[in-house]
């Protein structure tokens, strides 16, 4: 079986190498304004990820409609085995590594694997890590997350290292949709330094300044979801801050 990096992941890596950071917009397929959000973000995001934590009923239709609106990569971010459609370009094939329930860290992805293969979807291997205050959000509740305390950033860094040893190429530090506060800069910094894995950071990022800080600290991808649902016009400023931080980060490396 060919486990080489696929087309979508290659494109993302090329942008990351050139621009220093990526901006993903998360769309919940059950939100009524999903088409409006897709229209607003199509000129600013690097990819659209589609997913939700609670029952999805119209994923095929939503994905088709979003792909009519934009040429951006449409990547699935499945909350369960029903979060997969052949209409997408790729799927974040993930393990919720710090769930208390083995269903979420192993059984669910295993049950979904054959469907992903039959659909011909590109699988992007990713560790999904629930960070404080995720227990107060839907994904924390549904996923039975043993959340990683913000004051213990070294725990997150070791999970990221473990993920890289398992062969995962991406790790998502998730504070949860609508979180009170985002993943700390320190946690991002030491997780990136120890593991070298591509870091996705989301949850509680409400301003361009905060997004800038996260990228400078080591985030490779910033995800916004609730923000763009409530204020789709905010994506332009978010993109500008993320890309500015990416350029500054690249300069600091040289």
Swiss-Prot record:
Official protein name in the record: Geranylgeranylglyceryl phosphate synthase
CDD domains for the chain: PcrB_like
Subcellular location: Cytoplasm
GO CC terms, sorted: cytoplasm
Superkingdom, taxonomy of origin: Archaea
InterPro entries per UniProt: GGGP/HepGP_synthase_sf, GGGP_HepGP_synthase, GGGP_synth, IGPS_HisA/HisF
Biological source species: Methanococcus vannielii (strain ATCC 35089 / DSM 1224 / JCM 13029 / OCM 148 / SB)
PANTHER family: GERANYLGERANYLGLYCERYL PHOSPHATE SYNTHASE (PTHR21235:SF22), IMIDAZOLE GLYCEROL PHOSPHATE SYNTHASE SUBUNIT HISF/H IGP SYNTHASE SUBUNIT HISF/H (PTHR21235)
UniProt binding sites for Mg(2+): 28, 53
Residues binding sn-glycerol 1-phosphate: 172-178, 203-204, 225-226
Kinase keyword on record: no
The protein's annotated pathway: Membrane lipid metabolism; glycerophospholipid metabolism
EC identifiers of the protein: 2.5.1.41
């Amino acid at each position: 079986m060919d486990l080489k990096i696929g087309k979508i992941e290659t494109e993302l890596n090329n942008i990351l190498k050139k621009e220093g950071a990526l901006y993903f917009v998360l769309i919940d397929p059950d939100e009524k304004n999903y088409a409006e959000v897709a229209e607003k973000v199509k000129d600013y995001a690097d990819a659209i990820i589609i997913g939700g934590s609670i029952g999805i009923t119209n994923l095929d239709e939503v994905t088709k409609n979003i792909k009519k609106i934009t040429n951006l990569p449409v990547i699935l971010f499945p909350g369960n085995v029903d979060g997969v459609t052949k209409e997408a370009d790729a799927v974040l094939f993930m393990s919720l590594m710090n769930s208390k329930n083995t269903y979420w860290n192993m059984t669910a992805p295993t049950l979904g694997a054959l469907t992903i293969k039959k659909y011909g979807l590109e699988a992007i291997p990713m560790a999904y890590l629930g960070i404080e205050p995720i227990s107060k959000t839907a994904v924390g509740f549904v996923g039975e997350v043993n959340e990683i305390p913000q004051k213990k950033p070294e725990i997150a860094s070791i999970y990221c290292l473990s993920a890289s040893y398992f062969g995962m190429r991406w790790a998502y530090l998730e504070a949860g949709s609508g979180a009170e506060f985002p993943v700390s800069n320190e946690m991002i910094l030491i997780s990136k330094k120890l593991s070298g894995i591509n870091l996705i950071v989301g949850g509680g990022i409400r301003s361009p300044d905060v997004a800038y800080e996260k990228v400078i600290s080591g985030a490779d991808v910033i995800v916004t979801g609730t923000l763009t649902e409530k204020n789709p016009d905010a994506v332009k400023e978010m993109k500008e801050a993320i890309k500015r931080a990416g350029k500054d980060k690249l300069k600091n490396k040289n």
